[in-house]
Regions:
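Sterile Alpha Motif
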Residues: 1-8
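Structure-specific DNA junction-binding interface
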Residues: 5, 16-20, 31, 35-100
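An amphipathic, hydrophobic-aromatic interaction surface with interspersed Lys/Arg
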Residues: 26
Length: 100
């Protein structure tokens, strides 16, 4: 089990997805953030749910995902809906840029 798999709210499926995109430690996940982790997962062909965003954010705050404040959920949802640069995320997200 990786360090990410021992974080609160993150089970084996979340751990496998995050590990597959190069996220193995709490500092790596903290640097990437919940929204960019979700984006990186989708760019790499995974189909995470919005609940994973809540779970990651809550894990980083060390609280149960159901205790995530509504204003935090609203902020995260707004960030997800905002324009973003996929190329920059691929370059910064795991150090490997995909062709195409």
């Amino acid at each position: 089990m990786s360090e990410v798999g021992r974080m609160r709210n993150l089970g084996p499926v979340s751990e496998r997805m995050l590990n597959a995109v190069g996220v193995h430690t709490t500092p790596e996940l903290r640097e990437l953030g919940a929204v960019n982790a979700y984006r990186l997962l989708t760019l790499r062909g995974h189909t995470p749910s919005l609940n994973l965003v809540w779970a990651i954010e809550a894990a980083l705050m060390d609280i149960h995902w159901m205790d995530l404040p509504p204003e935090t959920k609203a902020r995260l949802k707004a960030e997800l809906e905002a324009p973003w640069d996929a190329r920059a995320l691929l370059e910064d997200g795991d150090g490997e840029e995909e062709d195409g």
